[in-house]
């Protein structure tokens, strides 16, 4: 699939995202990118709905989005940045680590996560690091540094 951007603010549709990332249901956790500076920064939207499978067990009486899925959403936005870098070898970049992750508020069905990631570094064209933040209604709900590695 060709990596096309929409004309407005370098946004990416869900179809564009599927062309950049290997994730599919139920792990496609980015609905659209609303700001995209390839290789530098991305801001994305994840709409949290009660229909998502994790809410059957986490928790039926009080559904909360698992923190690991918030972090995975941030990692996918970071992956969008890294996969668009022209000077890197082609291949699969995988989530390789996290530092300083903090969860500040619960995320529940009906929330809209606004996820921003900024590239911090690329080393030896194989390892990347981004700073990620997730907000709901303008309030920070999660932040941390995420690392990626190119798999041969």
UniProtKB/Swiss-Prot annotation:
| GO process terms (BP) | fatty acid biosynthetic process; lipid A biosynthetic process
One example of the protein's molecular function in GO is: (3R)-hydroxyacyl-[acyl-carrier-protein] dehydratase activity
> What EC number is given for this enzyme?
4.2.1.59
User: Where does the UniProt entry say this protein principally localizes?
Assistant: cytoplasm
The membrane-spanning stretches of this chain are none
Q: Where does the protein end up? A: Cytoplasm
Record's keyword annotation contains rRNA processing: no
**Assigned keywords, A-Z:** Cytoplasm, Lipid A biosynthesis, Lipid biosynthesis, Lipid metabolism, Lyase
Gene3D superfamilies the record matches: Hotdog Thioesterase
One Gene Ontology cellular component term attached to this UniProt record is: cytoplasm
**Record has S-adenosyl-L-methionine as a keyword:** no
- Which reaction is catalysed here? a (3R)-hydroxyacyl-[ACP] = a (2E)-enoyl-[ACP] + H2O
**Positions of the catalytic residues:** 58
Q: What does this protein do?
A: Involved in unsaturated fatty acids biosynthesis. Catalyzes the dehydration of short chain beta-hydroxyacyl-ACPs and long chain saturated and unsaturated beta-hydroxyacyl-ACPs.
The similarity comment for this entry is: Belongs to the thioester dehydratase family. FabZ subfamily.
What name has this protein been given in UniProt?
3-hydroxyacyl-[acyl-carrier-protein] dehydratase FabZ
Question: To which species is this protein native?
Answer: Prochlorococcus marinus (strain AS9601)
Give the gene name.
Answer: fabZ
